[in-house]
Regions:
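Bacterial N-terminal signal peptides
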Residues: 7-16
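Long luminal/extracellular ectodomains of secretory-pathway precursor proteins
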Residues: 20-179
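Positively charged n-region of N-terminal signal peptides that target proteins for export
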Residues: 1-4
């Protein structure tokens, strides 16, 4: 009789564990994905009239924060140079231009979660993104006869089913939000 009771108890625990595992799997499987959408613009003043125009054909990357460490190092390098009170402005500008060019070359080589390109209206979209973590969004484009465009934003932790909308500006410095 004690063996029968022990056997039935063991089977009951095993059945309960299987039921819990099935319930947990069902709950985990139903977490809706998040999405990140945005629009990239540039503010311009032409003949004393301020306008906003979309930034077309900007390559936009979505990264997990841990994969952007080399980019963050380039941001920090430029920020440290700008923070020096007795720094030579020309030398600081040159150092930041080099870091910007390196960032432009680096970003496409980093492992991205997703990529997109802005359309004619400057919009982009990342769908079916895993929630529960923050992301880094970095947009790059070769500059016409000048420095490349590098736009950076850090998202908050995405919630399940969240649809995050971003308004990005080419006018923001690439060293802006330190990642």
């Amino acid at each position: 009789m004690p063996k029968l009771f022990a056997c039935l108890s063991w089977l009951g625990m095993l059945g309960g564990a299987a039921l819990f595992a099935g319930q947990a799997k069902r709950l985990v499987g139903e977490v809706p994905p998040a999405s990140v959408r945005g629009r990239v613009i540039v503010f311009e003043t032409i003949n004393r009239k301020a306008t906003t125009n979309p930034v077309r054909d900007l390559q936009v990357y979505l990264f997990k924060p841990e994969t952007t460490k080399p980019f963050v190092e380039l941001q920090s390098k430029c920020r440290r140079a700008m923070a020096q009170p007795k720094a030579d402005p020309v030398q600081t500008y040159h150092l930041c231009e080099i870091a910007l060019a390196e960032a432009f070359e680096l970003v496409p080589t980093l492992p991205a979660v997703a990529t997109a390109k802005t359309g004619a209206d400057g919009s982009f979209s990342f769908e079916n993104i895993a929630p529960g973590r923050p992301y880094h969004v970095i947009g790059i484009k070769a500059g016409k006869g000048g420095s490349p465009i590098v736009i950076v934003v850090k998202t908050a932790r995405l919630r399940p089913g969240q649809q995050l909308s971003l308004e990005l500006s080419e006018n923001e410095p690439w060293t802006g939000p330190i990642m």
